[in-house]
UniProtKB/Swiss-Prot annotation:
The gene is rpsT. GO terms for molecular function: small ribosomal subunit rRNA binding; structural constituent of ribosome. It comes from the Bacteria. GO terms for cellular component: cytosol; small ribosomal subunit. This is Small ribosomal subunit protein bS20. HAMAP family: Ribosomal_bS20 (MF_00500).
Length: 92
């Protein structure tokens, strides 16, 4: 239990930040899931559209400190590879 005024304020700030970060993390997961569902359905156009929407969300989460920059980069890279593979198989 926080005793000093500054510790009490810090506790309040942490609680607010936690709520904001949870919302950001949830938003990122939603966008990534939409890309994965589009890939699973086999629709290359829908997958590309969903990927283009997810990419800035991942970058934003990394810049805000919700995700590590390397984690966001890795997720973008792997999603891009899967979307590209899907578009190659549908056109070939």
């Amino acid at each position: 239990m926080a005793n000093t005024t500054s510790a009490k304020k810090a506790t309040r700030k942490i609680a607010r930040r936690t709520d904001v970060n949870k919302a950001r993390r949830s938003r990122v997961r939603t966008f990534v899931r939409q890309v994965e569902e589009a890939i699973a359905s086999g629709d290359a156009a829908k997958a590309k559209e969903a990927f283009l929407a997810a990419q800035p969300e991942l970058a934003r989460a990394a810049s805000k400190g919700v995700l590590h920059a390397n984690t966001a980069s890795r997720k973008v890279s792997r999603l891009a590879a899967r979307v590209k593979a899907l578009s190659v198989t549908t056109t070939a």
